[in-house]
Amino acid sequence: VGGVTLANCKTWRRDHPLAIAAPAAVLAVALYAITLRGTFIWDDRFIAQDDPRLHDASGWRAYLHAGYRPNAVDNLWRPLTSLTFWAQWRLTGGITWRLHAMNILLHAAVSALVAALAHRLAGARAGLIAGLLFAAHPLHVEAVAYLVGRAETLCAAGVVAALLVMARRPLTVGRAVGVFAGAIVA
């Protein structure tokens, strides 16, 4: 008699931000799960497999001041990306499928953030559509399947998270600091 269903539950609404963001995250995981069988390719070998700093317990310090690629002269500096690879090596021993799983989870998180941002700016339907399109767009294949593409995914996460914070009205000092910090990290 009058059981609780998703349709009548007061704590669950179809337009709730989590209800909008979750399908995008699930789709991202489903679409890219096949990459769990991937191996190290191209720059993955230099940056996410053979970099001696990955295998040194104190190697994280070198990422704070040294370049992205070992012994390179290009001056790329991506400490957040490098530190995620270092941490994963320390925690998982560099098992390839786990490195790929992190890229998939990061893409799922960014897809959910895109859905949440579109939901905030244009409503529930727009959020759902934007999140699903972002999750499934083929442009992201390289960033998710190629391990070093993590740099782009982390950048997108910082930018979209900052925009999401900024989209809240009014923009308080605390939120402004959060937006600035997100932009710096990105």
Regions found by a protein language model. Give the residues of each.
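Polytopic membrane enzymes that build or remodel cell-surface glycoconjugates and lipids
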Residues: 1-186
